[in-house]
A protein has these predicted regions:
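Phosphate/pyrophosphate-binding catalytic cores of soluble transferases and nucleic-acid-acting enzymes
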Residues: 1-310
């Protein structure tokens, strides 16, 4: 089998540390699979690994895109697949690390993407959303694709527009397209290792603490620097949890403590969604940690799932 290990799990579950140690043990390099760590200048708010945390292990797909750029899962796979192939071609282990389940599935399982021709359809739908709001578009989506209409969050403008665009361009709903692609064999055979906690509250406590540490590490200054560099508050990158809330706070003179509580709440909700997504993958070997994790035990257990040697 290919020497690929995917370390997955919700935010603040310890993925970075495990990925680095596995890369060291199996002569590997880390391929980040995070939809926000791909942006430059956002290391604090996205919890991108520091040089110290990397421990000399080569990391890929971190800080490769401008924060003003719209970055999609298709673009990620386009850039990450050659990196993965290069790592393997040199006889090394590729340790994929990240909590963005869609990105990991698309890269390793080979989910194909619905065609996206440049006909102006997306721009037309975006203009409609700006003029009349997203609600009419969501209502149209529910008529043609009830499954997607029920699944997508009412404020997820980008995915609602994308789902409508796919139907209007191809005549096939995005739900049907996704069902077909899931029937295809995996593109890569990987060992999947999932990290979480025995008690969900322990994970939530770690998330709350992480947000507080981000503030201490200079998250607000990081956001100010992004805004000063000309990045629009409406940019996709600035809609990330931990940025949107503080951008609103900084630009509107809001209360930092209230914004912090909101970031913590949304981060906990996001972790719950991450777990829901990942638990659909029956290939994942889950390691559930106690409140005070024993990393040595976690590492030993992870190694038992890896059938190849460095």
């Amino acid at each position: 089998m290919e020497k690929i290990v995917c370390v997955a799990g919700p935010t603040a579950s310890g993925k970075t540390k495990l990925a680095v140690e596995l890369a060291k043990a199996y002569d590997g390099e880390v391929l980040s699979c995070d939809s926000m760590q791909i942006y430059r200048g956002m290391a604090i708010g996205t919890a991108a690994p520091t040089l110290e945390e990397m421990q000399g292990v080569v990391h890929h797909m971190i800080g490769v895109a401008d924060p003003g750029e719209v970055f999609s899962v298709g673009k990620y796979v386009e850039l990450a697949e050659p990196v993965l192939q290069d790592i393997l071609s040199r006889g090394k282990t590729c340790v994929v690390c990240g909590g963005t389940g869609l990105y990991a599935d698309s890269l390793l399982l080979g989910r194909s993407f619905a065609p996206c021709p440049s006909t102006g359809m997306r721009e037309t739908l975006e203009a409609e959303a700006r003029q009349s709001g997203i609600e009419p578009l969501l209502a149209r989506l529910k008529e043609v694709d009830p499954e997607a209409g029920a699944r997508l969050h009412p404020s997820d403008n980008r995915r609602i527009i994308r789902a409508l665009e796919v139907y209007l361009e191809t005549g096939e709903t995005i739900s049907e397209h996704n069902r077909k692609t899931k029937l295809l064999p995996p593109k890569h055979e990987a060992v999947w290792i999932g990290l979480s906690f025995e008690n969900r509250q322990d994970l939530y406590d770690r998330i709350d603490l992480r947000v507080e540490r981000m503030l201490q590490d200079g998250l607000l200054d990081e956001i100010r620097a992004l805004l000063a560099s000309g990045i629009s508050p409406a940019a996709t990158a600035m809609q990330a949890i931990g940025y949107k809330e503080y951008v609103d706070c900084l630009t509107a003179g809001g209360d930092v403590h209230a914004a912090t509580a909101l970031v913590q709440q949304r981060s906990r909700n996001y972790a719950k969604r991450q777990l829901t997504w990942l638990r659909r993958n029956e290939q994942i070997h889950w390691i559930l940690q106690p409140r005070e994790p024993d990393f040595a035990a976690v590492f030993r257990q992870a190694c038992t799932y890896i059938p190849f040697f460095a």
